[in-house]
């Protein structure tokens, strides 16, 4: 949910045109960081034993990251 508030695609595109090289590097590192955090959170949840809940959460988080990849 926080990613939707932080996206502001219009501002990102305007700044991205002026700073295309820097913007791509920062966006790439940010997406990798999001994926790493998602994996760590799902691994901790899987240890708690809520198997079915973790699987649905993993699917939702992966779809969110994929949509942001297409937006960038």
From Swiss-Prot:
The keyword Transport applies. Residues 16-58 are annotated as: Disordered. The keyword Transport applies. GO terms for biological process: transport of virus in host, cell to cell. Residues 40-58 have a biased composition (Polar residues). It comes from the Viruses. Keywords: Transport, Viral movement protein. Cell-to-cell movement. Belongs to the carmovirus/necrovirus/panicovirus movement protein p8 family. This is Probable movement protein p8. It comes from Tobacco necrosis virus (strain A). The lineage of its organism: Viruses, Riboviria, Orthornavirae, Kitrinoviricota, Tolucaviricetes.
